[in-house]
Amino acid sequence: VRGLFVTGTDTGVGKTVLSAALMLRYPEARYWKPIQTGPDDDSTEVGRLSGGQVLDKGIRLPDPVSPHLAARLAGMTIEIPSRATDGAVYIVEGAGGVLVPLNDTQTMVDLMARFGLPVVVAARTSLGTINHTLLTVEVLRARGLRVAGVAMIGTGNADNRAAIEHYGNVAVIAEMPHFDPLTPEALRRWADTLPKDLIA
């Protein structure tokens, strides 16, 4: 399987909009969010913004809390799904950050390791992002995952970008603004600036 796994330094950082932009840049890809918690439907939003193929098979939990707790409240236990073997290209979006618990013994990075896709990290541009981003990159590399790059989301901050690239030895592949309004057209224009070689 080929593609990218989109994770973030925390929840609400902008993974879904970034995933939609990657779908626009790689129109052959299929979007999949294996685990979704809370009332927001990220899959629908990616479909609206990208017009691309969105897979709806996944675990959907109603409570807007960490996946392990949402599953417990729903009376179930999350089991990590198997990776696709069909040779298609996927943009896979995680829930929360890399160490968010899924069950009593596994976190999101265990799911990511099973899929084995290169990872794009969505990170804020604001104060605190250096530490959060470097910690995320460190965890990913400790599990043998390749970090394809970091996408910084928000008002540009050259100092934070330079620090992340220097101390993390990682490329910041994109700087994405907060879109107001967020329309498919505006996102498409920005998506055209993304690197075209992230998926080998």
Regions found by a protein language model. Give the residues of each.
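Switch II (G3) loop of P-loop NTPases
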Residues: 83-103
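Short, structured coil segments at secondary-structure junctions
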Residues: 50, 115, 167-170
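Hydrophobic anchor at the beta1->P-loop junction of P-loop NTPases
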Residues: 6-7
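Short internal beta-strands
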Residues: 31-35, 120-123, 148-154
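N-terminal phosphate/diphosphate-binding loop that engages ATP/GTP or pyrophosphate donors
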Residues: 3, 12, 17-82, 86-88
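C-terminal lobe/tail of nucleotide-utilizing enzymes
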Residues: 137-200
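Inter-motif core of Ras-like GTPase G domains
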Residues: 103-126
